Amino acid sequence: GILDEGSFEAGFGFDGSSVRGFQAINESDLILKADLETTVIDPFFAKKTIAFLCDVYDPITHEAYGRDPRGITKRAEAYLKTTGIADTVYFGPEAEFFIFSNVSYEVGPNVSRYYIDSHEGFWNSGSNDASMVYLNRIKEGYFPLPPLDKTHDVRAQMVEIMEKMGITIEVHHHEVGGGGQAEIDMRFDTMLKMADQVQLYKHIVKNVAARNGLLATFMPKPLF
């Protein structure tokens, strides 16, 4: 539908029963209200598109929904002030991820398997592709230069978009995992701001990878 001033005052209804851990199907209605301070231009659409984060509200009581992660974060920050320990808390999560060139999986009555591949995987040393001569050894992928670091340019694209969308980046580099493990570090910020940024960060990483015909995952140990 068309956005107008009323849209932002009344909010946008959605089915809370379709969000795991939110509502039962017999009382599923919830409301999203946009936080306009989070508005960004999302570059991953063919047409110019704005995106913003929202807070969840109960449509009956018009109060903040108790299970909304942003609402919980705001209450945690408010509680901190009441303790007298501090007025502000800063977080600087070290978000790491893998960039893979191919992933497939299958689960059936007679089969269960998964397959992961990376242009940097040491297991590709027997390939006829000349570029596969440059492969990181097992657990020796920390800070290599190209051509060992084959994901540098993709990470640089991610960083460029992150900074355009308001995320301050301190450093990016290859990580120890030789098969495409990467790290892009954000500068620390307040709890809510950082929580919002992590969601945007993941959105950017996955979409830039997809643009390059790759797949990014934040699974902790897809490779051992």
Language-model-detected regions and their locations in the chain:
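Acidic, glycine-rich loop-and-beta core segments that form the ion-binding/anion-interacting portion
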Residues: Q181, M186, K193-F224
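Short, conserved phosphate-binding/catalytic loop or strand-edge motifs used
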Residues: A95, E175-I184
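A short glycine-rich, hydrophobically flanked beta-strand micro-motif that places a catalytic Asp/Glu
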Residues: E94-E96, E170-H174, L215-L223
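ATP/Mg2+-dependent ligation/transfer catalytic cores
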Residues: G1-E170, M191-L200
